[in-house]
Swiss-Prot record:
Transmembrane segments: none annotated. It is found in: Cytoplasm, Cytoskeleton. This is Dynactin subunit 6. It comes from Caenorhabditis elegans. One of its GO terms (molecular function) is dynein complex binding. PANTHER family: DYNACTIN 6, DYNACTIN SUBUNIT 6.
Length: 180
């Protein structure tokens, strides 16, 4: 985090200190931010909803010159994904090395496959999947559901292995009965 950052992290959010957070970023309840994630809000604020997962090396960058970037609830930004979207709704999966270009918009229950791109000023309707090397798209009938078990597991395990913003690292201790 830089000196000019205004970061608000909810008490139940897990944010590893190796994450790079710049500018005005608000991270709400239950989110999990892995090491080496980048939040770059130097050109405009980033507002992150509840229970999102940001995996290693995901880059979330607001390039809008003052307009807020809004990310809804229960999204997964997988490893090395990049987003400069002005809006990402809820229950979306942004795949490994996927790119959401400047100014695009992703509604709810969408899936952007590995190495796929949502282009600038493109707006994905609800329940659209983008797939294949040519960025084909189709409407799906089944909504995306982030597993509450996955996010709960990450909230428990990451503090054991990483330092967190605003929290002390968990330390395993042996009980008195085990020591005897």
């Amino acid at each position: 985090m830089t000196e000019t950052s205004t970061v608000s992290i909810a008490s139940s959010a897990i944010v590893c200190v190796e994450a790079d957070i710049k500018g005005e970023v608000i991270i709400k309840e239950g989110c999990v931010v892995h090491p080496f994630v980048v939040f770059d809000a130097t050109k405009g604020p980033i507002y992150v909803g509840e229970n999102n997962i940001f995996e290693e090396y995901a880059v979330i960058r607001n390039n809008s010159d003052g307009q807020p970037m809004i990310i809804g609830d229960w999204n997964i930004f997988q490893v090395h994904s990049k987003s400069s979207a002005k809006y990402v709704g809820s229950r979306n999966v942004i795949g490994v090395h996927a790119v959401l270009e400047d100014g695009c918009s992703v509604s709810d229950d969408c899936s952007v496959g590995a190495k796929c791109t949502v282009f600038s000023h493109q707006n994905l309707e609800p329940s659209v999947s983008v797939y294949a090397a040519t960025n084909l798209s189709r409407t799906t009938k089944t909504p995306n559901m982030t597993s509450p078990h996955q996010i709960e597991f990450l909230r428990k395990i990451l503090p054991s292995y990483h330092h967190l913003y605003g929290k002390k690292k968990a330390v395993a201790t042996a009980s008195a009965s085990a020591a005897q």
